Amino acid sequence: MSQYTEKEPAAMDQESGKAVWPKPAGGYQTITGRRYGRRHAYVSFKPCMTRHERSLGRAGDDYEVLELDDVPKENSSGSSPLDQVDSSLPSEPIFEKSETEIPTCGSALNQTTESSQSFVAVHHSEEGRDTLGSSTNLHNHSEGEYIPGACSASSVQNGIALVHTDSYDPDGKHGEDNDHLQLSAEVVEGSRYQESLGNTVFELENREAEAYTGLSPPVPSFNCEVRDEFEELDSVPLVKSSAGDTEFVHQNSQEIQRSSQDEMVSTKQQNNTSQERQTEHSPEDAACGPGHICSEQNTNDREKNHGSSPEQVVRPKVRKLISSSQVDQETGFNRHEAKQRSVQRWREALEVEESGSDDLLIKCEEYDGEHDCMFLDPPYSRVITQRETENNQMTSESGATAGRQEVDNTFWNGCGDYYQLYDKDEDSSECSDGEWSASLPHRFSGTEKDQSSSDESWETLPGKDENEPELQSDSSGPEEENQELSLQEGEQTSLEEGEIPWLQYNEVNESSSDEGNEPANEFAQPAFMLDGNNNLEDDSSVSEDLDVDWSLFDGFADGLGVAEAISYVDPQFLTYMALEERLAQAMETALAHLESLAVDVEVANPPASKESIDGLPETLVLEDHTAIGQEQCCPICCSEYIKDDIATELPCHHFFHKPCVSIWLQKSGTCPVCRRHFPPAVIEASAAPSSEPDPDAPPSNDSIAEAP
């Protein structure tokens, strides 16, 4: 059996500035190579097989040897499914991935694995055939530097670490064909139980693990706890493997040939006794049976592991598994610190609130790195601030777990109270422009605060001065304030006496604030605005105050504009507007027609002469109206004929009151009914004299008088 007893000069030069690591008394076999033109590492695991352990007998050394037994050589071209697991497997999972870190530097591939089992690593390479020794202890006696890294603790039961090896080595030397894999395993101290596994084969092929399992009957469960964190590893030397540093032992003329396909080396570990094994991060002796591989596991020293925990460093392309116990511990510390900061922050906020500050309070509670923020108005924030302060004080005294539940309950109750009040208060018309902007988040209203008037304060917010003592002393304060706000809202939304419900008049409240923007008006529904004097508050003044500002329709003259503008107006109001528009148009048309008629009368129909008017026959109206025929009333004055009235008849045989027709003929020489010219006898006489009496001429007064 060959052993490395000296350190190479090159390694001595590189490690001169670092602590000397005790060299193991044996070696391990690595087979490195390239596959598919890419540098790829293949790792197979199996628990060590039965062999009597060899005590080193050294004082101060607590590590024990790995026991190896017959390792069957298997060649697998494909992956085997996980359903081959024997039914005798305990209820715990077959394996759990523990913390594994594989930093790469140059041609060295170092790996630290926290696990409860001992492993055998096989590294395939292009170097044709390597022999290995059996029934001897092989140790790779070399020193290497470990790239700094931090591993988080994990609790693994029946745990076997699976190595995810990157196919590319970013810092590697392309001229080298050999990469070396070193596994460092740690088993927890004394009082831990270890479970024996049977013929379990784990194969990591192309980053996929498969288990070939034939388990022995279940034994006492093994609870493997690894250390929380490694020490700062910059100065801690670990194993550096190279092709020249590995020495193999030829025994029994057995050889293992590298196959072009995936190779799998299985190891079995069997512990029939209840002995407890401790494997520290120190050089270990490994025993190898005939034709089998013995793997050296180089780990850190126990004393060095008890050092201060370094800050975790995130490595690329390395999977890290953090145990739930460590996560709970860290989150507990974070929550406790966050609650302490929250207590201090809310105390300061409470002092600012009591000093009369009008700024909004921003409530931010840190839970597991997340921020739950809520913007509060001063009257409501006072309640939640006091509650949060009391609960946070209780939290700091009682603990992080109970305090968190109370803080959560108080926080969400405060959210419900605040948003319930906020929803009821945002529709209130009593909230002026300045108050609206003050209720906005602080980061949005900060630029507008300088523009607000000096007399703007929180006193205008309903319920502040009256409810402030109740809110601080009594837990039922928000409910009372909620009732008062709802009553005030009902009074604000109720219609004033005499106000028309379907036509709302919006007045601009110029005295409330000097700000130019009016956020509250953005939520108002579009409607027709009347003049400042037309409030329409009295029903009796509706007919007098309906002077609508028609200039508002100028921008909505066509199509969709009118539809959008009047879509929110009551139909009765639209009907009235349409009727008024029609009446106005009809009046304009009638006046124009009358003006045209007046001009025509003056030009075409000159007044009748006084002689012709005096020459009209007069008829005395009798009781039976036989003298005037069927006429019952005068067409000019529209009054009925009564007894002893004097009527006259025009040549067109239309009867009128003589005074009425005389006035008409003085203005126009036509019949008011048929527009026939008067006097026709004069016109006919001038045109053609006729000896025959005119049948249309009215009868003489004598004949009328003699008729009765």
From Swiss-Prot:
The lineage of its organism: Eukaryota, Metazoa, Chordata, Craniata, Vertebrata. Residues 531-708 are annotated as: Interaction with PRKAR1A, PRKAR2A and PRKAR2B. Has E2-dependent E3 ubiquitin-protein ligase activity. Responsible for ubiquitination of cAMP-dependent protein kinase type I and type II-alpha/beta regulatory subunits and for targeting them for proteasomal degradation. Essential for PKA-mediated long-term memory processes. Through the ubiquitination of MFHAS1, positively regulates the TLR2 signaling pathway that leads to the activation of the downstream p38 and JNK MAP kinases and promotes the polarization of macrophages toward the pro-inflammatory M1 phenotype. Plays a role in ciliogenesis by ubiquitinating OFD1. GO terms for cellular component: centriolar satellite; centrosome; ciliary basal body; cytoplasm; endoplasmic reticulum membrane; glutamatergic synapse; Golgi membrane; plasma membrane. Residues 74-90, 249-276, 484-493 have a biased composition (Polar residues). Residues 1-31, 53-90, 244-317, 425-495, 685-708 are annotated as: Disordered. Binds ubiquitin-conjugating enzymes (E2s). In vitro, interacts with the ubiquitin-conjugating enzyme, UBE2D2. The phosphorylated form interacts with PRKAR1A, PRKAR2A and PRKAR2B. Binds the catalytic subunits of cAMP-dependent protein kinase. Interacts with MFHAS1. Interacts with TBC1D31; the interaction is direct and recruits PJA2 to centrosomes. PROSITE patterns: ZF_RING_2. It comes from the Eukaryota. Residues 550-570 are annotated as: Mediates interaction with TBC1D31. Disulfide bonds: none annotated. Keywords: Acetylation, Cell membrane, Cytoplasm, Cytoskeleton, Endoplasmic reticulum, Golgi apparatus, Membrane, Metal-binding, Phosphoprotein, Synapse, Transferase, Ubl conjugation pathway, Zinc, Zinc-finger. Its main location: cytoplasm. It comes from Homo sapiens (Human). The modification N-acetylserine is found at residue 2. It is an enzyme of class 2 (transferase). This is E3 ubiquitin-protein ligase Praja-2. It is found in: Cytoplasm; Cell membrane; Endoplasmic reticulum membrane; Golgi apparatus membrane. GO terms for molecular function: protein kinase A catalytic subunit binding; protein kinase A regulatory subunit binding; ubiquitin protein ligase activity; ubiquitin-protein transferase activity; zinc ion binding. A zinc finger (RING-type) spans 634-675. Residues 699-708 have a biased composition (Low complexity). The modification Phosphothreonine is found at residues 246, 389. It is a peripheral membrane protein.
